[in-house]
């Protein structure tokens, strides 16, 4: 097996994920592995190193993103051909194999294109383009004042967030805001606990900055947890929201432990039984919660506008460092979004999306019952944009995913399952309603 000399130091502060990445890069640069070499599977390497599959998978995926590896469906991970690197003269010549055609995608991060008011959005973009005075500069580093004022009002009504425009920082996506937050918190805070499963990209970002990363459950809070907890009250990977009482308990615990809660309100507006629960930030005293909001699922994934609400103490620190940052989000899109929200267009759009996704949620659950019966168990479905299922089978989640792909259906395996049954996620955002039943019939054919 390749990578037999890969050794991990589990006593050092360097994360295991980073050690794997560095070791593979070193072997590549030293000509110990070459273009076309096939790496051990995630399962095999994690077993050999006696670590979690998630750690290996995150390392492999980061190397894919950086261009060092290629992930070929049904075949595995291969060393990519990089110019400037030495190659073995006898390196096997591999032909790229076309991935299986995906007809039904339950694993995409897109939106239903028919759900977005493209013409209306174009109208607001055109209006923003007429503001030549604002467009001639780089924009406000903290984000356009007009948008921050609008967001303060909107988030108060929609999510119960209590803040002033001055507390809001705009950025091109959550990751850019997390980078700012890391700079604000260091060196006082250099460790974080995240829910599992959670936002893997956030975990990689904190890890890459040398932070110690732990996992926790909101059901089991410990006094020994770090002073920063990354919380998604409407966790998209769990398909359920924290109840008001659970949120109050979490806030009480954070106050007692003098811990910051980093609230990622991803999908917080999508709850299908009862009204969405108010944000943690709005239920708090305003000093313990850092709030993150995004428009990637409300509007477009390509609309790179997210925002962060800082408590007063961290806002002071941000102002001390503010001169170091330029705005990463488009001024044109910020101005267009401000007008879009102020005119009530976003509120009406979210209302339509709730109806659309609630209907898809119901159709998917009904079809699962009709087609699979007791062979699947819906673990969670009350909020978010996925259903989380347990499949009554001896197969692993990876095997279920592979067999589904062979039959033209893409799904997401779940790696944090605490039960004996494999679990998967089915996203119903991008799939058409009339494709739900045929897609599930293909899954049944693939699995049973």
Label each region the model flagged.
Residues 111, 233-236, 297, 431:
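Short glycine-rich anion-binding loops that position phosphate/pyrophosphate groups of nucleotides
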């Amino acid at each position: 097996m390749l990578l037999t000399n890969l050794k991990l130091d589990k006593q050092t502060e360097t994360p295991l994920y980073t050690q794997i990445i560095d070791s593979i890069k070193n072997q590549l640069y030293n000509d110990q592995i070459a273009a076309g070499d096939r790496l051990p599977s995630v399962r095999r390497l994690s077993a050999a190193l006696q670590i979690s599959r998630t750690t290996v998978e995150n390392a492999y995926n980061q190397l894919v993103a950086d261009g060092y590896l290629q992930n070929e469906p049904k075949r595995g991970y291969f060393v990519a051909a990089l110019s400037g690197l030495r190659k073995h003269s006898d390196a096997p010549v591999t032909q790229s194999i076309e991935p299986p055609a995906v007809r039904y995608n339950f694993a995409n991060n897109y939106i239903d294109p028919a759900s977005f008011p493209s013409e209306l959005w174009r109208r607001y973009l055109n209006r923003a383009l007429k503001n030549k005075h604002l467009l001639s500069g780089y924009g406000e580093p903290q984000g356009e004042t007009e948008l921050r004022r609008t967001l303060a009002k909107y988030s108060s009504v929609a999510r119960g967030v209590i803040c002033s425009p001055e507390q809001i920082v705009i950025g091109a996506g959550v990751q850019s805001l997390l980078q700012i937050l890391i700079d604000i918190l260091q060196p006082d805070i250099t460790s974080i606990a995240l829910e599992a499963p959670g936002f893997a990209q956030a975990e990689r970002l904190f890890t890459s900055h040398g932070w110690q990363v732990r996992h926790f459950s909101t059901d089991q809070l410990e006094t020994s947890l770090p002073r920063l907890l990354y919380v998604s009250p409407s966790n998209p990977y769990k398909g359920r929201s924290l109840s008001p009482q659970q949120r109050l308990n979490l806030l009480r615990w954070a106050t007692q432990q003098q811990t910051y809660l980093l609230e990622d309100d991803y999908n917080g507006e999508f709850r299908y039984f009862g009204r969405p629960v108010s944000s943690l930030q709005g239920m708090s005293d305003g000093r313990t919660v850092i709030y993150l909001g995004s428009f990637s699922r409300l509007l477009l994934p390509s609309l790179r506008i997210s925002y962060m609400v800082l408590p007063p103490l961290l806002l002071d620190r941000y102002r001390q460092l503010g001169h170091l940052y330029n705005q990463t989000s488009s001024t044109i899109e910020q101005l267009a979004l401000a007008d879009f929200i102020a005119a009530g267009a976003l509120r009406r759009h979210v209302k339509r999306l709730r109806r659309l996704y609630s209907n898809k949620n119901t159709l998917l659950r009904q079809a699962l019952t009709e087609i699979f019966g007791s062979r699947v168990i819906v673990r969670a479905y009350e909020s978010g944009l996925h259903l989380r299922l347990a499949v009554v089978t001896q197969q692993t989640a990876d095997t279920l995913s592979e067999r589904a792909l062979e039959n033209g259906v893409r799904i997401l395996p779940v790696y944090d399952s605490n039960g004996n049954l494999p679990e998967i996620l089915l996203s119903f955002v991008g799939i058409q309603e009339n494709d739900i039943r045929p897609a599930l019939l293909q899954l049944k054919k693939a699995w049973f």
